[in-house]
Amino acid sequence: LECALYSVSTVQEEIGLRGAITSTYAVDPHVGVAVDVTHATDCPTIDKKTEGDVRLGGGPVIYRGPNMNPVVTSRLVSIAGRLEMTYQPAASGRPTGTDAN
């Protein structure tokens, strides 16, 4: 895949999704991928029925949902499979609160 890759570290994405706006003006990307944290649910204080089954050490999480580009998501899953990389699928029924929304 031939492409230009830009990596940007941002802040304030939880407050109005403002963190990456200034960077995107300069870069004008075709696709954005947010690398962010999520919560492991393999502890007694989190309900897996509500939050899903995400295990610490279980591999990166690839989310599906209405704000995730299905083509990009499918491509990430395909690449993980080709590389025999363990990943954890998860779902989000709403915007995620990251700069990629």
For the regions a language model picked out, list residue spans one by one.
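Active-site-adjacent substrate-binding region
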Residues: 52-101
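Acidic/histidine-rich catalytic neighborhood of metal-dependent amide-processing enzymes
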Residues: 1-59, 94-96, 100
